[in-house]
């Protein structure tokens, strides 16, 4: 057997690399690309470390514990940091000419100056936002407090007004209720009086037999008291005396209920002699026409004491 030569080994290695790239669908990484990636990582680490160690006493170099190649960290001196702060307070924007001048004066690289300004602007923006937020919050709290105080004052004023109105309300309803009660009492009294009059002077049963009370009937003996001559006197006292004096004459002429035959000649309870005497006494008066012959026929009633016979 022949031993494999160096050329065959190289071709075999290239074939393996190509197969790996085809299987993983990834391009083959060359040595140049690896070197460029390592340089970019180193630059990023330097940018982060410049801002973290800018408060150091003087420029010092120390080996990185995480890096096995023994790379050095660069720290900014206190004088350098103060000079950069003064430059930032003057103008936080950094142009290329100014960046080169600051780096030359402080003995730094232009890239270090650019990274420091970038980080300082980020911190300045954060602090500015915090200050603005604190100012807005204080202003908002003051406005809310003022609005709350105004609302409380309005609430107290409205509560006082409500109390005043409530104190005034009970008087008017009480007067109204009292007037309503008085009117209701008057209406009830009037209704009771009307009911009493109807009960004493009228009869609910119109179909029943006609029965009159001697005192309430218009044809009773009390209704004819005072028909004598003394009743026509103008004086009220004389009329009263006439009524009382005519009572014996009325009693003398009253004979009570008569029989059926006596009812045919006159009115119920009165005789023709008594009516003639009354008409003769009042012949000279104006009211005598009430008992004249033509009106006397109207006083003849057709019922008798028994009430069994009809009109005649």
From Swiss-Prot:
- Which InterPro entries does this UniProt record tie to the protein? HD, HDZip_class_I_plant, Homeobox_CS, Homeodomain-like_sf, HTH_motif, Leu_zip_homeo
The record, for Gene3D superfamilies, names: Homeodomain-like
Q: Which SMART domains match?
A: HOX
Q: Which Pfam families match?
A: HALZ, Homeodomain
Record's compositionally biased regions (Acidic residues): 35-54
Question: Cellular component GO terms, alphabetically?
Answer: nucleus
Q: Which GO terms describe its molecular function?
A: DNA-binding transcription factor activity, RNA polymerase II-specific; sequence-specific DNA binding
Q: Where in the cell is it found?
A: Nucleus
Q: Which residues bind DNA?
A: 70-129
- Say what the protein does: Probable transcription factor.
Query: What PANTHER family has UniProt attached to this entry?
Result: HOMEOBOX-LEUCINE ZIPPER PROTEIN, HOMEOBOX-LEUCINE ZIPPER PROTEIN HOX13
Mind telling me what this protein is named?
Homeobox-leucine zipper protein HOX13
